[in-house]
Amino acid sequence: MEEKIIKEAFESKRQFFDSGNTKSYEFRVAQLKTLRKAIEENENEILDALYKDMHKPKFEAFTSEIGIIYDEIDFALKNLKKWMKPKKVSTPLVVHPSTSKIHPEPLGVVLIIGPWNYPFQLLINPLVGAIAAGNCAILKPSDNTRNTAQIIEKIISNIFPQNYVSVAQGPGAMVGPMLIEKYAFNHIFFTGSPNVGKQIMAMASKHLTPVTLELGGKSPAIVHSDANLKVSAQRLIWAKLFNAGQTCVSPDYLLVHESIKDVFIDLMRKTVVQFLGNDPSTSENFT
């Protein structure tokens, strides 16, 4: 994406936010409902894009990428009025007899950077929060899942004006720094690796931009000698194979009691065959 286009996208959103149009309850609700309707209308295209990019089975793709967003939007619509209400807080003695309240206010223009492992859900879910909070947003989808990025841009450009929400496509190593270093976003939401998260935090510090970093890590699992081994094997294999193991909380390694080691390994092998057959790479249920 050209720097001129990025500059225009950021500055137009700053102007639109400063107009105050995004702050009202009615505006936020309307945008959330519009987003939900657009996802529903493009559901099949989204599922097709996820299959082309990652071979995601439709059921797995719906549950992990689309259904979660419906729940998030419904939750926001149900609670938004309560979230926007001023909250009474205690008043310091030195300013008595006054009273004190906290008035929730939108931050401004936010940047949302999504990963490739859940390319739809982990970009749109944070957008739901940004819209509910009354912000404008620029979305940066992963360039590793181009079909999904294209359907996201199609949906967003069809339902939202460019000065409210837009999509910035391109190589992450080029577009990301261009966005973060040159423009003073009011918040950055990033999902990805710790190494890239550190770089984003360092770049954002130039503008004192607060960041939310959802990062990956190691996820050990412990199996005691008195555990139900069959159930444990099924749960662990499901968790490890879901989305081909590309989930931040997917179990990375097991700590098992030595007395059950061989039996448990055999059970896990049998469970893989039960779930995906002798050759998982040919299974339509494997991402």
Predicted regions and their residues:
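ALDH superfamily catalytic-core signature
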Residues: 195-287
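N-terminal Rossmann-like NAD(P)+-binding subdomain of aldehyde/semialdehyde dehydrogenases
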Residues: 1-101
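Amphipathic, non-transmembrane alpha-helical secondary structure
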Residues: 7, 33, 74, 124, ...
